Amino acid sequence: MEEIKRYLQRNRSHHQDFLYPLIFQEYIYAFAHYRGFSQSILSENPGYDNKSSLLLVKRLITRMYQQNHFLIFPNDSNQNPFFARNKNLYSQIIPEGFAFIVEIPFSLRLISCLEGKKIVKSQNLRSIHSIFPFLENNFSHFHFVLDVLIPHPVHVEILVQTLRYWLKDASSLHLLRFFLNEYCNWNSCILPKKAGSSFSKRTQRLFLFVYNSHVWEYESIFVFLRNQSAHLRSISSGVLLERIYFYGKMERLVNVFVKVKDFRSNPGLIKEPCMHYIRYQRKSILASKGTSLFMNKWKCYLVTLWQWHFSLWFHPRRIYINQLANHSLEFLGYLSSVRMNPSVIRSQILENAFLINNAIKKFDTLVPIIPLIMSLAKAQFCTVLGHPISKPVWADLSDSNIIDRFRRISRNLSHYHSGSSTKKSLYRIKYILRLSCVRTLARKHKRTVCVFLKRSGSELLEEFLMSEEGVPFFTFQKGFSTLRGIYRSRVWYLDIFSINDLANHK
């Protein structure tokens, strides 16, 4: 039992250095600002951001050094003269820098872990597309999945208490508590409805970091159960004794942490080694080769785990048991499913010929065209029916700037949805963006589309027709010698680290 407790509290006894003094360092805000722009895939050009200029950061740090200017009132933050005067300005810069600071201890642990395991090219594993080869290799063999909507804490104080195990700096925790209570909102941060302002973007990163730290607490229990049970498949005498001892430890673990009274009657709950867990945003997927009864046991276990150990009210109706053969998963902007691919094999023995019908399971990924068109309509690129329109807010920009913005949007969407099994939906999205670009340019020059194209020529839109730039990728289908064959195959890129706002339909 002591061994299990030490595992669940791994590295929590290690005190971290104080992080609060880093808030007063100028280079922290420079790093945070550069990281936000370098990882951005938004349609806007970064340009010059006066809200993050060095002069403003110096003025901000000077005001924080002044006495009684950085006091936090628990009841009303408007009483604070520091935030009351420049709330919409300083409150955007400080959370961005503070989010960069609190990630430092976790980044150091991640680097040391990758170096210890000698993982080569670990940056490729950060790509969102790297998860799809895993689904291709494993999901076609599974039968059922648990589609889970992860519950969130009823109060942000639960999130702060989670980080107390890792951060021993009381000042940083108090400042974190202030930011969470003042600026964060569950609905707008976890499930953003649309691409918000820079204010929401800056505060969202801090909130998501704290939220993911909280979710990791109960995910670590899953990892422990999975890693221990996966090594108990041998039937040798030594491992058999270890297996019996492990099941005994599991009963005590669940009785202490989860309080499942009937766990002894369901020992098969953790004996299934072929299980896979995936989480994205507020959803998670638990796939297995087991039966429907086995998945119902896991459903009851998850509900009890959250309610008893993590004090989270969770309704069983938030967990759906779906059969992969009859259900599609809305996963990271794709509709993923496992469909049967029928084939006929002709076999001949001497003078007798036979036709054998064979069906092979195939992992399929499609682009949901309707939600994507709705996202383009909200961004004012087209109507709700998919008819391209002009972008009035960009009409005052230069022609090259307008074309560059549309080109980057088209390139980002093409890269992100390059793994689609069919390219028809992608062709339609490119058509909408191209015609929207032409209409925007025609609106700027106060001409019709036909007149504008006749005077400008086809060279103006050649940016859209240029081939994609070379980036690392891999495909699932057999390679072709022609570009046409490569374009028809599914391509997964290794340089995509965040979901495009237009592809995020939630």
Curated annotation (Swiss-Prot):
Database matches in InterPro entries: Domain_X (IPR024937), Maturase_MatK (IPR002866), Maturase_MatK_N (IPR024942)
Molecular function in Gene Ontology: RNA binding
Keyword Nucleus part of the UniProt annotation: no
CC per GO annotation: chloroplast
Chain segments annotated as coiled-coil in the UniProt record: none
GO biological process: mRNA processing; RNA splicing; tRNA processing
Keywords noted in UniProt: Chloroplast, mRNA processing, Plastid, RNA-binding, tRNA processing
A Pfam entry, by short name: MatK_N
Compartment(s) where it occurs, according to its Swiss-Prot or TrEMBL record: Plastid, Chloroplast
Family: Belongs to the intron maturase 2 family. MatK subfamily.
Role played: Usually encoded in the trnK tRNA gene intron. Probably assists in splicing its own and other chloroplast group II introns.
Protein name as catalogued: Maturase K
Organism annotation: Avicennia germinans (Black mangrove)
Organism ancestry: Eukaryota, Viridiplantae, Streptophyta, Embryophyta, Tracheophyta
Originating gene: matK
